[in-house]
Amino acid sequence: TPVVNPPFLQQT
């Protein structure tokens, strides 16, 4: 399963 990045790492 792919790991989802935490909100503070969601640099879009």
From Swiss-Prot:
GO terms for cellular component: extracellular region. One of its GO terms (biological process) is defense response to bacterium. It is found in: Secreted. Keywords: Antibiotic, Antimicrobial, Bacteriocin, Secreted. It comes from the Bacteria. Disulfide bonds: none annotated. Has antibacterial activity against the Gram-positive bacteria L.monocytogenes, L.lactis subsp lactis and L.curvatus H28, but not against the Gram-positive bacteria L.curvatus CWBI-B28, L.brevis and L.plantarum or the Gram-negative bacteria E.coli and Pseudomonas sp 55. Has no antifungal activity against S.cerevisiae, Penicillium sp BKS-TAN2 or A.niger. This is Bioactive peptide 1. It comes from Latilactobacillus curvatus (Lactobacillus curvatus).
